[in-house]
């Protein structure tokens, strides 16, 4: 690989594959790392081998490694050999529901795997920007302690202090995270520490709902993609608590990749950013049902379960002020309505089961 190599972990996933394509178009050679653990975690519905085939088709010279990020020596060898100019770390065990069933796998993947990559970068690529895809789950259920106002189709923050959403200064400890959230906190803090302690150009992106037409959404992960998938295929969607009024902000994978490239062009050490669609691209589940029906022409089939998921947010959307201040050339380019239309078109053209 050349000096302009970008190493992308989780390259078969939604964000990883988008980053591979975006950086290739920006002139980088691409080394992807992915052993299709989504198929292990979620079964055939989570399989991303189709995405890898797409990368090999669309990126001339694409190179791929199936190294497991839990394999410390394998990761060290890979980074030593490649000496990437940029490292984008999107690989993860992404489900907070499943983490409780596989706690060792979850922590080894999310926390230890991130440490393996950070140490490999410190040894062999210390000046290369290191971008870690974190999660808003690092805030645990603390956002639920904020005063809320119930509206017709959604919950929202009652305090005008949060009119733009949750900022990076919001506390991340002394709350219920789920085991997934806790393992991601460990990774998030370690990414910051390598940046601040060793002076490395690192950032952790605390993602809201990351989505797009290439997302292999399943019930345990990928809220908007899975919701639209259910709409398109006529599958029943289960709503867990909060009257279906729980709110998420949604960001298209292209806008995620655009921000990552902006960071690479002007890196900082040990930064964190809340990366989401902001209030303008937020929706409740009930509102998402209406948008999906508008995009597909089909009514949503759904059922309601009173018990909410452990640690689930009642309302969460990202305050994008810090991101836009540090990187004023970046902004949301894909509206929620446009994103849902793209997801609906994608699921309509993919061979999927209605079971």
Which residues fall in each region the model found?
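A short C-terminal helix-loop "cap" of Rossmann-like NAD(P)-dependent dehydrogenase/epimerase domains
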Residues: 52-60, 154-170, 228-240, 266, ...
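N-terminal Rossmann-like NAD(P)+-binding domain of SDR-like oxidoreductases, especially those catalyzing
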Residues: 1-208, 346-347
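Amphipathic terminal alpha-helices
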Residues: 2-5, 28, 321, 334-355
